[in-house]
Design a protein with these regions (language model features):
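Active-site neighborhood of phospho(di)ester-bond hydrolases with catalytic His/Asp-centered motifs
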Residues: 1-2, 20-25, 57-64, 90-93, ...
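Active-site environment of divalent metal-dependent phosphoester hydrolases
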Residues: 5-10, 27-31, 64-72, 95-97, ...
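Active-site-proximal segments of metal-dependent phosphoesterases and phosphodiesterases across multiple
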Residues: 27, 31-43, 144-186
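Short, electropositive alpha-helical surface patch
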Residues: 72-90, 168, 172, 203-222
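Binuclear metal-dependent phosphoesterase catalytic core
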Residues: 97-99, 180-185, 196-254
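Binuclear metal-dependent hydrolase catalytic cores centered on His/Asp/Glu-rich metal-binding motifs
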Residues: 101-147, 167-177
């Protein structure tokens, strides 16, 4: 799932799985720029939710609304993550292997200046003011892996197309450069979010020169209302197959 923006789905309505993946924008909108309140939220509501989820691991990469993860000094961030507990695995340009399945998380996005994990602007990055490197530098770090978590989707068909209220306003917010970097890479599945109203169906893109399966797993729409259910898949690493176990069909809005 992705783009929770503070909404924590009822754990009793989540099916039992091995791993839950979250592709960013978890922090409530109303406090997203208030580090003290975000830290408190992570240590309390978020921690309790993580512990109640019916899974063994929760693997998270942040998004452009998650300013706390971008700006907090690394020692502070590590302390907060340790407080949440070992069940949560935080991936920021880093890898993790669970039961032989490799995961990599890339939070970086192409986008306007002033947002978290958007290169090209001078801002507080883990407690130090610095000029953020280019998006290519961050994409170059992406290795071959079984499961790739990116906040922004690659520009592939309508995966990152925002339709808002009508197709006349459609715009592709996917990353062309991410699509180029994924070309010919051996990645089984790429989960992303960022664009709430992007195509949530299974997408294949054979012209990319790979067999990667792409999913937009945001759970909110462009009006920040819960609109999609979590996506469930069964990944069989031995024969490189992905079986869909559930859908993200539109649900009744609040």
């Amino acid at each position: 799932m992705s783009d929770l923006h503070g909404h924590l789905p009822n754990p009793e309505q989540i099916e039992k799985v091995d791993v839950v993946v979250i592709c960013g924008d978890i922090v409530p909108l109303k406090i997203q720029r208030a580090s003290m309140f975000v830290d408190e939220w992570l240590r309390n509501e978020f921690k309790e939710w993580i512990q109640l989820l019916p899974c063994e691991r929760v693997i998270l990469t942040p998004g452009n609304h998650d300013f706390y993860f971008h700006s907090a000094p690394r020692t502070k961030l590590e302390d907060t993550l340790n407080h949440v507990g070992k069940k949560l695995v935080y991936l920021e340009d880093s890898s993790y292997i669970y039961k032989g399945v490799s995961f990599y998380g890339c939070p970086w996005c192409t986008g306007p200046l002033g947002w978290a994990f958007c290169p090209g602007n001078s801002m507080l990055f883990h407690g130090v003011y610095k000029e953020i490197v280019t998006i290519e530098d961050m994409y170059n770090k992406i290795p071959e892996c079984d499961v790739l978590l990116t906040h922004q989707p690659p520009s592939i068909e309508n995966l990152g197309t925002s339709f808002h209220w009508d197709k006349a306003r459609a715009k592709d917010w996917g990353s062309d450069r991410l699509r180029v970097h994924l070309k010919d890479k051996n990645i089984l599945v790429n989960f992303s979010g960022h664009v709430h109203s992007g195509d949530h169906e299974r997408i294949l893109y054979p012209t990319l020169g790979c067999d990667t399966v792409f999913y937009n797993v945001s759970i909110k729409n462009e009006q920040y209302k819960v609109a999609f259910q979590p996506r469930y898949i069964l990944l069989n690493k031995e024969d490189k197959t992905i079986i869909e176990m559930g859908t993200t069909k539109m649900i009744t809005l609040d």
